[in-house]
Curated annotation (Swiss-Prot):
InterPro entries: POM121-like_prot_1. It comes from the Eukaryota. Residues 242-251 have a biased composition (Basic residues). Residues 75-90 have a biased composition (Basic and acidic residues). This is Putative UPF0607 protein ENSP00000332738. PANTHER family: POM121-LIKE, UPF0607 PROTEIN ENSP00000332738-RELATED. Residues 91-126 have a biased composition (Polar residues). Residues 228-241, 254-266 have a biased composition (Low complexity). Residues 75-130, 215-281 are annotated as: Disordered. Belongs to the UPF0607 family. Pfam families: POM121.
Amino acid sequence: MRLCLIPWNTTPHRVLPPVVWSAPSRKKPVLSARNSMMFGHLSPVRNPRLRGKFNLQLPSLDEQVIPTRLPKMEVRAEEPKEATEVKDQVETQGQEDNKTGPCSNGKAASTSRPLETQGNLTSSWYNPRPLEGNVHLKSLTEKNQTDKAQVHAVSFYSKGHGVTSSHSPAGGILPFGKPDPLPAVLPAPVPDCSLWPEKAALKVLGKDHLPSSPGLLMVGEDMQPKDPAALRSSRSSPPRAAGHRPRKRKLSGPPLQLQQTPPLQLRWDRDEGPPPAKLPCLSPEALLVGKASQREGRLQQGNMRKNVRVLSRTSKFRRLRQLLRRRKKRWQGRRGGSRL
Protein backbone atom coordinates (compact mmCIF):
# COMPACT_ATOMS: atom_id res chain seq x y z
CA MET A 1 0.00 0.00 0.00
CA ARG A 2 1.17 3.51 -0.81
CA LEU A 3 0.71 6.40 1.49
CA CYS A 4 -0.21 9.79 -0.06
CA LEU A 5 0.73 12.74 2.11
CA ILE A 6 -0.55 16.26 1.63
CA PRO A 7 2.30 18.78 1.02
CA TRP A 8 3.34 21.21 3.75
CA ASN A 9 2.81 24.33 1.69
CA THR A 10 -0.96 24.15 1.90
CA THR A 11 -1.08 24.27 5.72
CA PRO A 12 -0.13 27.21 7.93
CA HIS A 13 2.93 27.13 10.18
CA ARG A 14 2.94 25.41 13.56
CA VAL A 15 -0.09 23.29 12.52
CA LEU A 16 0.44 19.68 11.54
CA PRO A 17 -1.45 18.66 8.40
CA PRO A 18 -3.92 15.83 8.72
CA VAL A 19 -2.63 12.58 7.31
CA VAL A 20 -5.07 10.71 5.06
CA TRP A 21 -4.35 7.01 4.61
CA SER A 22 -6.04 5.84 1.41
CA ALA A 23 -5.21 3.11 -1.05
CA PRO A 24 -4.77 4.21 -4.69
CA SER A 25 -7.30 2.77 -7.11
CA ARG A 26 -5.93 0.66 -10.00
CA LYS A 27 -9.07 1.04 -12.13
CA LYS A 28 -8.84 3.13 -15.28
CA PRO A 29 -11.60 5.62 -16.19
CA VAL A 30 -13.98 4.15 -18.66
CA LEU A 31 -16.07 6.36 -20.95
CA SER A 32 -19.73 5.64 -20.60
CA ALA A 33 -23.04 7.39 -21.10
CA ARG A 34 -22.87 8.77 -17.60
CA ASN A 35 -19.32 10.21 -17.49
CA SER A 36 -19.03 11.07 -21.19
CA MET A 37 -20.07 14.65 -20.42
CA MET A 38 -17.17 14.92 -17.96
CA PHE A 39 -14.33 13.40 -20.02
CA GLY A 40 -15.48 13.61 -23.63
CA HIS A 41 -15.88 16.58 -25.99
CA LEU A 42 -19.13 18.48 -25.90
CA SER A 43 -21.27 17.88 -28.98
CA PRO A 44 -23.87 20.37 -30.23
CA VAL A 45 -27.41 19.60 -29.24
CA ARG A 46 -29.63 18.87 -32.18
CA ASN A 47 -33.34 19.43 -32.00
CA PRO A 48 -35.51 16.93 -33.87
CA ARG A 49 -37.45 18.16 -36.84
CA LEU A 50 -41.14 18.85 -36.57
CA ARG A 51 -43.08 16.16 -38.37
CA GLY A 52 -46.57 17.67 -37.99
CA LYS A 53 -47.57 20.65 -40.14
CA PHE A 54 -49.85 23.48 -39.03
CA ASN A 55 -51.03 26.59 -40.86
CA LEU A 56 -51.09 30.07 -39.35
CA GLN A 57 -54.30 31.93 -40.19
CA LEU A 58 -53.59 35.66 -40.47
CA PRO A 59 -56.34 38.19 -41.22
CA SER A 60 -56.25 39.59 -44.73
CA LEU A 61 -55.79 43.28 -45.43
CA ASP A 62 -59.21 43.55 -47.05
CA GLU A 63 -60.98 42.36 -43.94
CA GLN A 64 -59.15 44.69 -41.58
CA VAL A 65 -61.23 47.68 -40.56
CA ILE A 66 -59.18 50.83 -40.11
CA PRO A 67 -61.08 53.44 -38.04
CA THR A 68 -60.78 56.87 -39.62
CA ARG A 69 -62.33 60.19 -38.77
CA LEU A 70 -64.35 61.98 -41.37
CA PRO A 71 -62.96 65.44 -42.22
CA LYS A 72 -65.08 68.37 -41.20
CA MET A 73 -67.02 69.86 -44.07
CA GLU A 74 -66.17 73.49 -44.64
CA VAL A 75 -68.94 75.63 -46.04
CA ARG A 76 -68.02 78.99 -47.45
CA ALA A 77 -70.62 81.61 -48.02
CA GLU A 78 -70.45 82.93 -51.56
CA GLU A 79 -71.03 86.59 -52.14
CA PRO A 80 -73.98 87.49 -54.34
CA LYS A 81 -73.12 88.60 -57.85
CA GLU A 82 -74.58 92.06 -57.28
CA ALA A 83 -72.38 92.61 -54.23
CA THR A 84 -69.20 91.60 -56.09
CA GLU A 85 -70.02 93.98 -58.98
CA VAL A 86 -70.59 96.86 -56.56
CA LYS A 87 -67.31 96.08 -54.78
CA ASP A 88 -65.39 96.18 -58.11
CA GLN A 89 -66.91 99.57 -58.95
CA VAL A 90 -65.90 100.95 -55.56
CA GLU A 91 -62.30 99.76 -56.00
CA THR A 92 -61.99 101.42 -59.43
CA GLN A 93 -63.43 104.69 -58.07
CA GLY A 94 -60.97 104.61 -55.15
CA GLN A 95 -58.05 104.26 -57.56
CA GLU A 96 -59.28 107.28 -59.57
CA ASP A 97 -59.53 109.37 -56.38
CA ASN A 98 -55.95 108.49 -55.43
CA LYS A 99 -54.73 109.59 -58.89
CA THR A 100 -56.44 113.00 -58.76
CA GLY A 101 -55.11 113.85 -55.27
CA PRO A 102 -56.22 116.74 -52.98
CA CYS A 103 -56.97 120.28 -54.23
CA SER A 104 -54.22 122.95 -54.38
CA ASN A 105 -56.20 125.52 -52.33
CA GLY A 106 -56.05 123.29 -49.21
CA LYS A 107 -59.80 122.84 -48.99
CA ALA A 108 -61.55 119.49 -49.15
CA ALA A 109 -62.79 118.56 -52.62
CA SER A 110 -66.56 118.60 -52.96
CA THR A 111 -68.32 115.44 -53.97
CA SER A 112 -69.21 116.31 -57.59
CA ARG A 113 -69.69 112.70 -58.59
CA PRO A 114 -73.24 111.43 -58.98
CA LEU A 115 -74.92 109.94 -55.95
CA GLU A 116 -74.78 106.48 -57.47
CA THR A 117 -71.17 106.20 -56.36
CA GLN A 118 -72.21 107.09 -52.83
CA GLY A 119 -74.87 104.45 -53.03
CA ASN A 120 -72.26 101.99 -54.19
CA LEU A 121 -70.05 102.94 -51.27
CA THR A 122 -72.83 102.34 -48.81
CA SER A 123 -73.65 99.07 -50.49
CA SER A 124 -69.99 98.02 -50.19
CA TRP A 125 -70.19 98.74 -46.48
CA TYR A 126 -73.32 96.68 -46.20
CA ASN A 127 -71.95 93.59 -47.96
CA PRO A 128 -69.96 91.44 -45.56
CA ARG A 129 -66.68 89.73 -46.39
CA PRO A 130 -66.61 86.09 -47.46
CA LEU A 131 -67.01 83.87 -44.44
CA GLU A 132 -64.64 81.00 -43.75
CA GLY A 133 -64.96 78.01 -41.46
CA ASN A 134 -67.98 76.03 -40.37
CA VAL A 135 -71.13 78.03 -41.04
CA HIS A 136 -74.67 76.91 -40.30
CA LEU A 137 -77.11 76.94 -43.20
CA LYS A 138 -79.60 78.95 -41.17
CA SER A 139 -77.18 81.83 -40.59
CA LEU A 140 -76.21 81.76 -44.31
CA THR A 141 -79.79 82.13 -45.46
CA GLU A 142 -80.44 84.96 -42.99
CA LYS A 143 -77.33 86.87 -44.10
CA ASN A 144 -78.16 86.41 -47.80
CA GLN A 145 -81.64 87.80 -47.18
CA THR A 146 -80.25 90.85 -45.37
CA ASP A 147 -77.70 91.44 -48.17
CA LYS A 148 -80.44 91.32 -50.82
CA ALA A 149 -82.55 93.75 -48.80
CA GLN A 150 -79.62 96.17 -48.44
CA VAL A 151 -78.85 96.07 -52.19
CA HIS A 152 -82.52 96.70 -52.93
CA ALA A 153 -82.46 99.70 -50.61
CA VAL A 154 -79.37 101.16 -52.33
CA SER A 155 -80.86 100.72 -55.81
CA PHE A 156 -84.05 102.39 -54.61
CA TYR A 157 -81.97 105.23 -53.20
CA SER A 158 -80.01 105.75 -56.47
CA LYS A 159 -83.09 106.02 -58.73
CA GLY A 160 -83.68 109.72 -58.04
CA HIS A 161 -85.08 110.22 -54.57
CA GLY A 162 -83.87 113.05 -52.42
CA VAL A 163 -81.08 112.76 -49.86
CA THR A 164 -81.40 114.17 -46.35
CA SER A 165 -78.64 116.54 -45.26
CA SER A 166 -78.04 118.73 -42.25
CA HIS A 167 -77.03 121.78 -44.38
CA SER A 168 -79.62 121.51 -47.17
CA PRO A 169 -82.47 123.99 -47.66
CA ALA A 170 -86.17 123.30 -48.05
CA GLY A 171 -86.77 120.92 -45.22
CA GLY A 172 -83.37 119.31 -45.19
CA ILE A 173 -83.76 117.62 -48.64
CA LEU A 174 -81.32 118.04 -51.52
CA PRO A 175 -82.33 117.48 -55.16
CA PHE A 176 -80.67 114.65 -56.99
CA GLY A 177 -77.33 115.47 -58.63
CA LYS A 178 -76.35 118.46 -56.44
CA PRO A 179 -73.50 117.93 -54.01
CA ASP A 180 -73.84 118.49 -50.30
CA PRO A 181 -71.72 121.47 -49.11
CA LEU A 182 -70.58 119.49 -46.03
CA PRO A 183 -71.40 115.83 -46.62
CA ALA A 184 -72.16 113.82 -43.53
CA VAL A 185 -69.57 111.06 -43.17
CA LEU A 186 -70.98 107.83 -41.91
CA PRO A 187 -68.97 106.04 -39.20
CA ALA A 188 -66.91 102.97 -39.97
CA PRO A 189 -68.73 99.67 -39.82
CA VAL A 190 -68.47 97.85 -36.50
CA PRO A 191 -67.65 94.12 -36.72
CA ASP A 192 -70.27 91.63 -35.52
CA CYS A 193 -73.03 94.26 -35.57
CA SER A 194 -76.03 93.32 -37.67
CA LEU A 195 -78.13 96.45 -36.89
CA TRP A 196 -75.62 99.05 -38.15
CA PRO A 197 -76.47 98.80 -41.89
CA GLU A 198 -80.16 99.05 -41.13
CA LYS A 199 -79.58 102.19 -39.03
CA ALA A 200 -77.52 103.79 -41.81
CA ALA A 201 -80.12 102.96 -44.45
CA LEU A 202 -82.88 104.45 -42.31
CA LYS A 203 -80.87 107.65 -41.81
CA VAL A 204 -80.23 107.99 -45.56
CA LEU A 205 -83.77 107.20 -46.75
CA GLY A 206 -86.83 109.24 -45.93
CA LYS A 207 -89.88 108.06 -44.05
CA ASP A 208 -92.11 108.04 -47.14
CA HIS A 209 -89.54 106.22 -49.30
CA LEU A 210 -88.78 103.28 -47.08
CA PRO A 211 -88.33 99.99 -49.04
CA SER A 212 -90.55 97.03 -48.36
CA SER A 213 -87.70 94.74 -47.25
CA PRO A 214 -88.09 92.43 -44.25
CA GLY A 215 -84.66 93.30 -42.83
CA LEU A 216 -85.42 97.04 -42.55
CA LEU A 217 -89.01 96.66 -41.36
CA MET A 218 -87.88 94.70 -38.29
CA VAL A 219 -86.26 97.79 -36.79
CA GLY A 220 -88.26 99.45 -33.99
CA GLU A 221 -89.90 102.86 -34.02
CA ASP A 222 -86.89 104.47 -32.36
CA MET A 223 -84.71 103.68 -35.37
CA GLN A 224 -87.04 105.38 -37.90
CA PRO A 225 -86.21 109.01 -38.80
CA LYS A 226 -88.61 111.80 -37.91
CA ASP A 227 -90.32 114.29 -40.19
CA PRO A 228 -88.34 117.42 -41.19
CA ALA A 229 -90.80 119.64 -39.32
CA ALA A 230 -90.31 117.59 -36.18
CA LEU A 231 -86.54 117.76 -36.68
CA ARG A 232 -86.69 121.58 -36.97
CA SER A 233 -88.75 121.92 -33.82
CA SER A 234 -86.45 119.59 -31.91
CA ARG A 235 -83.36 121.53 -33.06
CA SER A 236 -84.83 124.98 -32.43
CA SER A 237 -86.17 124.18 -28.97
CA PRO A 238 -83.45 124.59 -26.28
CA PRO A 239 -82.70 121.63 -24.02
CA ARG A 240 -84.71 121.52 -20.85
CA ALA A 241 -82.93 122.10 -17.59
CA ALA A 242 -82.66 119.36 -15.05
CA GLY A 243 -84.84 121.30 -12.61
CA HIS A 244 -87.88 121.43 -14.92
CA ARG A 245 -89.35 118.07 -14.11
CA PRO A 246 -92.97 117.11 -13.59
CA ARG A 247 -93.72 117.55 -9.93
CA LYS A 248 -95.81 115.17 -7.94
CA ARG A 249 -99.35 116.00 -6.93
CA LYS A 250 -99.75 117.57 -3.55
CA LEU A 251 -102.21 115.93 -1.21
CA SER A 252 -105.23 118.12 -0.48
CA GLY A 253 -106.05 118.70 3.17
CA PRO A 254 -103.95 118.74 6.31
CA PRO A 255 -101.38 116.01 6.72
CA LEU A 256 -102.24 113.09 8.92
CA GLN A 257 -100.74 113.29 12.38
CA LEU A 258 -99.84 110.18 14.29
CA GLN A 259 -100.95 109.92 17.87
CA GLN A 260 -98.04 110.04 20.25
CA THR A 261 -98.05 107.39 22.92
CA PRO A 262 -97.43 108.69 26.46
CA PRO A 263 -94.20 107.61 28.09
CA LEU A 264 -94.29 104.78 30.59
CA GLN A 265 -94.63 105.93 34.17
CA LEU A 266 -92.45 103.84 36.44
CA ARG A 267 -93.22 103.70 40.15
CA TRP A 268 -89.60 103.07 41.05
CA ASP A 269 -86.32 104.66 40.14
CA ARG A 270 -84.32 103.51 37.16
CA ASP A 271 -81.42 102.34 39.29
CA GLU A 272 -83.64 100.29 41.56
CA GLY A 273 -85.45 97.16 40.51
CA PRO A 274 -89.23 96.60 40.68
CA PRO A 275 -90.72 95.79 44.11
CA PRO A 276 -91.31 92.13 44.97
CA ALA A 277 -94.65 90.63 44.13
CA LYS A 278 -97.18 90.60 46.96
CA LEU A 279 -98.82 87.39 48.14
CA PRO A 280 -102.61 87.18 48.05
CA CYS A 281 -104.25 88.30 51.30
CA LEU A 282 -106.02 85.50 53.24
CA SER A 283 -108.70 85.85 55.88
CA PRO A 284 -107.86 84.85 59.53
CA GLU A 285 -110.26 81.90 59.39
CA ALA A 286 -108.48 80.50 56.35
CA LEU A 287 -105.15 80.95 58.10
CA LEU A 288 -106.45 79.04 61.17
CA VAL A 289 -107.74 76.18 59.01
CA GLY A 290 -104.43 75.98 57.25
CA LYS A 291 -102.50 75.88 60.49
CA ALA A 292 -104.77 73.16 61.90
CA SER A 293 -104.30 71.03 58.81
CA GLN A 294 -100.55 71.46 59.07
CA ARG A 295 -100.63 70.33 62.70
CA GLU A 296 -102.70 67.27 61.87
CA GLY A 297 -100.29 66.31 59.17
CA ARG A 298 -97.35 66.65 61.52
CA LEU A 299 -99.09 64.57 64.20
CA GLN A 300 -99.84 61.84 61.71
CA GLN A 301 -96.25 61.76 60.58
CA GLY A 302 -95.09 61.58 64.23
CA ASN A 303 -97.47 58.75 65.02
CA MET A 304 -96.31 56.80 62.01
CA ARG A 305 -92.70 57.13 63.09
CA LYS A 306 -93.55 56.02 66.63
CA ASN A 307 -95.43 53.02 65.39
CA VAL A 308 -92.53 52.00 63.19
CA ARG A 309 -90.18 52.29 66.11
CA VAL A 310 -92.44 50.25 68.36
CA LEU A 311 -92.85 47.56 65.76
CA SER A 312 -89.15 47.39 65.21
CA ARG A 313 -88.57 47.11 68.96
CA THR A 314 -91.15 44.40 69.46
CA SER A 315 -89.75 42.41 66.57
CA LYS A 316 -86.27 42.68 68.00
CA PHE A 317 -87.42 41.57 71.45
CA ARG A 318 -89.28 38.64 69.99
CA ARG A 319 -86.20 37.52 68.12
CA LEU A 320 -84.05 37.83 71.24
CA ARG A 321 -86.53 35.81 73.31
CA GLN A 322 -86.62 33.07 70.72
CA LEU A 323 -82.81 32.89 70.68
CA LEU A 324 -82.64 32.72 74.47
CA ARG A 325 -85.17 29.91 74.61
CA ARG A 326 -83.24 27.86 72.08
CA ARG A 327 -80.03 28.29 74.04
CA LYS A 328 -81.68 27.21 77.29
CA LYS A 329 -83.02 24.08 75.65
CA ARG A 330 -79.57 23.22 74.35
CA TRP A 331 -77.97 23.70 77.75
CA GLN A 332 -80.57 21.61 79.39
CA GLY A 333 -80.12 18.81 76.89
CA ARG A 334 -76.37 18.76 77.36
CA ARG A 335 -76.64 18.66 81.12
CA GLY A 336 -79.15 15.81 81.07
CA GLY A 337 -76.98 13.76 78.74
CA SER A 338 -73.88 14.25 80.83
CA ARG A 339 -75.67 13.10 83.94
CA LEU A 340 -76.86 9.92 82.31
